Amino acid sequence: MPLSYQHFRKLLLLDDGTEVGPLEEELPRLADEDLNRRVAEDLNLGNLNVSIPWTHKVGNFTGLYSSTVPIFNQEWQTPSFPKIHLHEDIINRCQQFVGPLNVNEKRRLKLIMPARFYPNSTKYLPLDKGIKPYYPGHVVNHYFQARHYLHTLWKAGILYKRETTRSASFCGSPYSWEQELHHGRSVTKTSQRHGDESFCSQPSGILSRSSVGPCIRSQLKQPRLGLQPHQGPLATSQSGRSGSIWARVHPSTRRSSGVEPSGSGHIDYSASSSSSCLHQSAVRKTAYSHLSTSKRQSSSGHAVEFHKVPPNSARSQSQGPVFSCWWLQFRNSQPCSEYCLSHLVNLLEDWGPCADHGEHHIRIPRTPARVTGGVFLVDKNPHNTAESRLVVDFSQFSRGSTRVSWPKFAVPNLQSLTNLLSSNLSWLSLDVSAAFYHIPLHPAAMPHLLIGSSGLSRYVARLSSNSRIHNHQYGTLQNLHDSCSRQLYVSLMLLYKTYGRKLHLYSHPIILGFRKIPMGVGLSPFLLAQFTSAICSVVRRAFPHCLAFSYMDDVVLGAKSVQHLESLYTAVTNFLLSLGIHLNPNKTKRWGYSLNFMGYIIGSWGSLPQDHIVQKLKHCFRKLPVNRPIDWKVCQRIVGLLGFAAPFTQCGYPALMPLYACIQARQAFTFSPTYKAFLSKQYMNLYPVARQRPGLCQVFADATPTGWGLAIGHQRMRGTFVAPLPIHTAELLAACFARSRSGATLIGTDNSVVLSRKYTSFPWLLGCTANWILRGTSFVYVPSALNPADDPSRGRLGLYRPLLRLPYRPTTGRTSLYAVSPSVPSHLPDRVHFASPLHVAWRPP
């Protein structure tokens, strides 16, 4: 007869009311392999090979072979990004605020000023892969929305735009390392390899300064990077030298309007083997006529003023030689049908420039006209579907033999968090807007983190049925109109209402590199965690009576009273703003005395999962089918949810071990009614995880494979096992006996497995029961030689070792508390004293 739920509870000793024998007899039984096997068979836990078809969906959890169709929202708003500029002298500013920084804080702040990224190898992908065809039904809309998002990021100073192979432009305030690379500031060595005068960049991408003779100086003034107008004498003297960049480009391309490879003006790259890979001129717009008034430092140190190009030669680009640009070609062509794009292009006289250029130009290491990752848009988060979020896929750096092993960093575990944050403080949490985009990246990383798009014409051609990318006879009118279709015309007409003349700008190819850290690289979470933990450490030192703590971009502040918290909030906000950190004041949340953080509610009583997680648990058990094999992928998702709440249940993680085993074996799992009832009962009653208190250890446990011994104060006890047990199992049993005999929450043991409080590797029934008995117990390590319970466990009761005075201090784990806050008094004062922390600790920044 299968094991009923009541019997199973009795077996696990979970029922308080039932009469069971003494624990010393009952517990070792649960370690018996035979019993564990019989129970597993009864509960159908071990039977992984099933012939019935697997279930692939349980509630909201989907498993193998299921494809969730992403939903595209035509109304998505592109979020706005503030002009984020983290101040470069952040260390000095912190030191003015709080005095000298300690080593940990300095090291962390230096890591991010600027951040560096050097992958082992980088795979370059064609531009067509820049915007992923994630929404096959909304290709054009997705293209323009993604392109608009990229443009917004570039305008906000988050991206560099590749102008030529070796130069980039950006918006926003430049950092000092960018000013060193500013065009014309530093004179570069010329490498004489192959008679080429290309920039020789050092590994870091910073170009060396050196005093160069006047002859080279005069050559450097020539427009090698297209940053000066091509005027007669310079341009002609240039074409004689074979090595220079401009000599490689067909002379016809040297015009003042932008060069467009995907248009028809077929460019002949004489020196390059594959013309398809050189879209460089796409981003190498030689037209800098809009820069005509800006002054630039020349290499010789004199300011060179851009000469104004005579008005007739600098016609507005949209009226200039039209054959340079796919979009403007439609203006002079005969409409091919009522859905021809020429109808749209003729709506506007002036479509604006073909390319936008940033406020600043810098030199960069050689950057090919390629991308290294694709982008697509999704909902900003499950609660905000009105705004979009850009997903950047740089997964190439985490794959294959050349993958980058990302640095590891400490994530606070539940017990550490509770020890640290469980107190009766008032709490509020701050919202850092676009946290990742605060941290600047060195320009040398740009060639590895490239995103972009190949331009609308190629994008549409690639997705239409017969790919016309391979026939290079651009420019014939028939080819131009190949892309006209009703669908494209209707989409563009609707988009014209949204974007207006920007449609022209967005239809051009573009290559962008990251100037701030992107989210799709494993380095970014590490850097963000280092950054916010260092800042919080500074805040804790500045306000010693308060607590500041962060995990990634989630920053919380705690203070003893609401008034104190408000003044702290004002001071900290001003401090963070002075560093250039952007906070979103609308999203500041005041929590009162129970803080919501990282999915937990943390109050003076301890921590529990937040309510939405409790609701998910209830929903999960309502939908969980019985006696049907569930595919292991679904099990993985169920275990993810149950694992989060496991520390709050009686039996903890050990209860989930059968599920873990089936996931590891990649087999289906069948819930028997008893196992489901057991789990659901476990998760319906959640117990808070309390904070650990410091104290003196008075109770010690020790065991040998054949016997156990306890030292409780001056009392000694011993016992033997019926059969020899593995040593870890014996030690665990001894710890359980110590807890049940003495009721002490602090036990000394010399076994590392018991100390770790992970009971998942023990026999299943014993692990579940031991977790319940030892819940809330803290363990102190005591070396075997000093353990007072060592002798009793070996059967020697007469010998007395002196009782140790073992103090126990609860740990906050590796959560970076470099500045340890003084402990907060546990009671609230009846009234504010005049020596209140408001008057004493709060110094204006």
UniProtKB/Swiss-Prot annotation:
It catalyses: DNA(n) + a 2'-deoxyribonucleoside 5'-triphosphate = DNA(n+1) + diphosphate; Endonucleolytic cleavage to 5'-phosphomonoester. Residues 180-348 are annotated as: Spacer. Pfam families: DNA_pol_viral_C, DNA_pol_viral_N, RVT_1. Activated by host HSP70 and HSP40 in vitro to be able to bind the epsilon loop of the pgRNA. Because deletion of the RNase H region renders the protein partly chaperone-independent, the chaperones may be needed indirectly to relieve occlusion of the RNA-binding site by this domain. Inhibited by several reverse-transcriptase inhibitors: Lamivudine, Adefovir and Entecavir. It comes from the Viruses. InterPro entries: DNA/RNA_pol_sf, DNApol_viral_C, DNApol_viral_N, HBV_DPOL, Rev_trsase/Diguanyl_cyclase, RT_dom, Viral_Replic_Matur_Polypro. Residues 349-692 are annotated as: Polymerase/reverse transcriptase domain (RT). The record marks Y65 as: Priming of reverse-transcription by covalently linking the first nucleotide of the (-)DNA. Gene3D superfamilies: 3.30.70.270. PROSITE patterns: RT_POL (PS50878). Residues 186-205, 222-245, 288-318 are annotated as: Disordered. Residues 289-301 have a biased composition (Polar residues). Residues 359-602 form the Reverse transcriptase domain. Residues 1-179 are annotated as: Terminal protein domain (TP). Terminal protein domain (TP) is hepadnavirus-specific. Spacer domain is highly variable and separates the TP and RT domains. Polymerase/reverse-transcriptase domain (RT) and ribonuclease H domain (RH) are similar to retrovirus reverse transcriptase/RNase H. The polymerase/reverse transcriptase (RT) and ribonuclease H (RH) domains are structured in five subdomains: finger, palm, thumb, connection and RNase H. Within the palm subdomain, the 'primer grip' region is thought to be involved in the positioning of the primer terminus for accommodating the incoming nucleotide. The RH domain stabilizes the association of RT with primer-template. Multifunctional enzyme that converts the viral RNA genome into dsDNA in viral cytoplasmic capsids. This enzyme displays a DNA polymerase activity that can copy either DNA or RNA templates, and a ribonuclease H (RNase H) activity that cleaves the RNA strand of RNA-DNA heteroduplexes in a partially processive 3'- to 5'-endonucleasic mode. Neo-synthesized pregenomic RNA (pgRNA) are encapsidated together with the P protein, and reverse-transcribed inside the nucleocapsid. Belongs to the hepadnaviridae P protein family. HAMAP family: HBV_DPOL (MF_04073). This is Protein P. It comes from Hepatitis B virus genotype A3 (isolate Cameroon/CMR711/1994) (HBV-A). The gene is P.
